A protein has these predicted regions:
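Glycine/Thr-rich phosphate-binding loops that ligate phosphate moieties of nucleotide
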Residues: 1-149
Length: 149
């Protein structure tokens, strides 16, 4: 599954490789992996630019699902960390605003509570290798679909 990819503007979304044995769970996993392949493209570009991605901290709704977090760790070949307070930007902005208003005396202490680790996901080398091979096949498919549309 893919869509919204800048390199292939004509490709909107496809499910490929499905059989009659695949169920709704397989389709949901396709959705997650499709997003993950787009993440792979982005993180590959970051790494080529010299940005260190040995650990990613995931926040908001996407941090609440264990399977999704493990898929991200495997696909991106990086340690993924989730936080006990998954809210991300909104609660952090509220803390900064409360500090600015004088309601919180110690900004650093308040923010550190936001950074307590909930879970850590380590990439599985076998899964990472499988995703990398599939990613290369995906590139071939995207080029073909982009040219056909």
């Amino acid at each position: 599954l893919t869509g919204g990819n800048g390199d292939y503007p004509n490709v909107r979304g496809t499910f490929t490789g499905l059989t009659l044995d695949d169920d709704q769970g397989a389709l949901w996993r396709c959705v997650l992996e499709g997003i993950g392949y787009d993440y792979m493209e982005i993180t590959d570009r970051y790494r080529k630019a010299g940005i260190d991605l040995t650990q990613l901290t995931i926040t908001e709704g996407g941090s609440r699902d264990e399977l999704w977090n493990q898929i991200k760790a495997d696909m991106l070949d990086t340690k993924v960390v989730t936080l006990k307070v998954a809210g991300g930007a909104v609660p952090t902005n509220c803390i900064v605003a409360a500090y600015a208003a004088g309601d919180i005396p110690d900004l650093k202490q308040a923010l550190q509570r936001q950074l307590e680790i909930k879970a850590t996901y380590i990439p599985d080398e076998n899964h990472t290798a499988t995703y990398r091979k599939a990613y290369d096949k995906r590139e071939t498919l995207l080029k073909a679909l982009n040219g056909a549309l």
